[in-house]
């Protein structure tokens, strides 16, 4: 006997406004709205965003089904069309056969043996940041992490100096893109980005300035034919095994923009939230310092130390549970399709939230508590797939996952070995969901040099 399939519109849902549907609730506080939906309803929740059909998915098996079926549930959503204005048809912005080819071409540069070669560079950049830190001073640690991860990605990707013209143009375009995307998000992506509004003009001017310098750099590399050992050199050398073709300048530009955005913002924000959580939980911070002192004995960490820095890695894993770098994943249904016993209509925006999944008490007892020790008994292997998804899941899981994990661990170990950080009084820390999840007003912290480094 076949299982009954229920149409999406028949499922229970929150009360909607006449014209706006659920848009007003979603725009006001999307994380809280979806979190409340997950506590009031089951698995799949039909929503209406203006005149658009949507479905919030938080059943793990249904989440995995949506993320696995990449040809049925594509990224062709209004939000991703906005992101495409920055990353073009890079891995973040493409779909279908084109995406599959780009993923196949790009995958080799992120093999483990390649990325470990960048470990020393990551630590050296972190040491340069340490030289600017002083005991008993206040820093915006979020800005420090942004600056540091941008320096690392510029060096590993382009062998570029952070103070150089190309790096400065890219940094400006990224900053403008976050502001612009947030405005688009608040408007529900209803206004075409081509409208001659001042905010649109400023944003596209910044992207154009970045593009001009990136194309110049690509041309210089092609003319010199030099192998600088960075990721751009690898991308220039890669050939498609099926037909011997290589990436065009436009494809290279799109992948560079994608890798800078994904490799810079996400790691910086994950580290910023980690510093906040450590300051709020001194017993966890003390355990972290104990591991660093025992393993490193006061010396600079290396990639070879990573297997011994297990608690350091669980601290980051727990931080990304509570504050995932990306809080909302969206897909567009290209056809009618059954998910979790429910018929999803064509043209429906499927929304999944790592923020909500990671705070579910069914899988994480005391879900709002910061407890790195919960990961020490292979919890991740025991969880159903689709529950813990800080890097996404399925065929489109983050290609730079290994790079980001290595980078974050080395940065945290290098800095926490030398300093203890404390939150300054009087600041309001607010999680601000844009393309990534960042502290809205920065993160001001007082630095205290540690004297017991082993």
Q: Which functions belong to the PLM regions below?
A:
Residues 2-101, 116-128, 206-209, 335, ...:
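N-terminal membrane-proximal hinge/A-helix region immediately C-terminal to the signal-anchor transmembrane segment
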Residues 2-11, 75-83, 94, 98, ...:
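Cytochrome P450 heme-thiolate monooxygenase catalytic core
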Residues 352-379:
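Conserved cytochrome P450 K-helix/beta-meander segment immediately N-terminal to the heme-binding cysteine loop
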Residues 3, 7, 11, 35-38, ...:
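Cytochrome P450 proximal C-terminal region
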Residues 266-291, 402-417:
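Cytochrome P450 catalytic-core helices
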Residues 22-42, 212, 216, 299-340:
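Conserved cytochrome P450 K-helix E-x-x-R motif and the immediately C-terminal K′/meander segment
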């Amino acid at each position: 006997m076949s299982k009954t399939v229920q149409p999406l519109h028949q499922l229970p849902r929150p009360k909607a406004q006449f014209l706006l549907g659920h848009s007003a609730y979603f725009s006001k506080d999307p994380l809280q709205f979806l979190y409340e939906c997950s506590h009031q309803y089951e698995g799949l929740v039909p929503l209406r965003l203006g005149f658009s059909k949507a479905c919030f998915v938080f059943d793990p098996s249904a989440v995995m089904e949506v993320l696995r079926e990449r040809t049925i549930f594509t990224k062709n959503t209004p939000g991703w069309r906005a992101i495409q204005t920055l990353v073009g048809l890079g891995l973040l912005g493409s779909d279908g056969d084109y995406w599959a080819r780009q993923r196949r071409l790009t995958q080799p540069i992120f093999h483990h043996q390649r990325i470990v070669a960048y470990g020393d560079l990551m630590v050296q950049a972190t040491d340069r940041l340490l030289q600017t830190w002083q005991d008993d001073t206040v820093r915006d640690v979020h800005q420090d992490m942004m600056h540091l991860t941008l320096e690392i990605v510029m060096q590993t990707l382009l062998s570029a100096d952070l103070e150089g013209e190309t790096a400065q143009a890219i940094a400006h375009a990224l900053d403008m893109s976050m502001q612009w995307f947030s405005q688009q998000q608040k408007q529900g992506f209803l206004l075409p980005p081509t409208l001659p509004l001042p905010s649109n003009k400023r944003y596209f001017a910044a992207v154009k300035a970045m593009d001009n310098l990136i194309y110049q750099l690509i041309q210089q590399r092609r003319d010199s034919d030099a192998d600088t050992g960075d990721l751009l050199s690898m991308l220039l050398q890669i050939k498609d095994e099926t037909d011997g073709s290589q990436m065009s300048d436009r494809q290279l530009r799109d992948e560079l923009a994608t890798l800078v955005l994904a490799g810079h913002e996400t790691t910086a924000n994950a580290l910023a939230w980690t510093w906040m959580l450590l300051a709020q939980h001194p017993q966890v911070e003390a355990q972290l310092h104990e591991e660093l002192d025992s393993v490193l004995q006061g010396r600079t960490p290396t990639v070879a130390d990573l297997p011994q820095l297990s608690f350091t890695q669980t601290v980051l894993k727990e931080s990304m549970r509570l504050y995932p770098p990306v809080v909302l994943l969206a897909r567009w249904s290209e056809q009618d399709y059954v998910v979790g016993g429910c018929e999803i209509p064509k043209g429906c925006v499927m929304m999944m939230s790592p923020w909500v999944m990671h705070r579910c008490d069914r899988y994480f007892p005391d879900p709002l508590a910061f407890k790195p020790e919960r990961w020490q008994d292979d919890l991740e292997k025991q969880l159903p797939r689709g529950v813990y998804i800080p890097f996404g899941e399925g065929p489109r899981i983050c290609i730079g996952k290994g790079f980001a994990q290595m980078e974050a661990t080395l940065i945290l170990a290098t800095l926490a070995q030398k300093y203890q950080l404390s939150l300054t009084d009087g600041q309001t820390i607010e999680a601000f969901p844009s393309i990534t999840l960042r502290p809205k007003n920065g993160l001001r912290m007082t630095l205290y040099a540690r004297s017991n480094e082993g």
